[in-house]
Amino acid sequence: MSATGQPDNAIQMGFKPMLPGFDYAEYNNLEDFKSKVTENTIAIMIEPVQGEGGVHPATQEFIEGLRKLCDEKDMLLLFDEVQTGWGRTGAPMAYTGYGVKPDAVSMAKAVGGGMPLAACCATEKVAKAFTAGTHGSTYGGHCVTCAAGLASVTEILDNNLS
């Protein structure tokens, strides 16, 4: 909730104080993102397609620029695909249409086929930080939700629904 691009909104009500250290930049504005990067910046997290208040896809130039910036500054590029993942944009993940690989991607909603399920996929380098006992999930590993997730993803992939 600290990372939401809509600070001080209803999503955060009742949950303060938020974690410090988050900064926000204008979507699709690479120069604004660059201006916010400091020696303490470790990652940039965005939605490849923003879904609140309409449908707002990132430009190709913006996504490619973020990947280049993160590579140059040794930062992680994180994609939030909770709204757009698993076929909701006509591709398995919205980011796949950009030809840019994130360091990690979060997904939910469609991945569970209506059941409460979420996932985080990461590169091997990033995944090494997730050691046993350091990352938890409310619904992690539940047999019913995992079966629903497997069925949902299988249906999407086997029937070319993305």
Range-by-range predicted roles:
Residues 1-162:
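Conserved N-terminal phosphate-binding loop of PLP-dependent enzymes in the Aspartate aminotransferase
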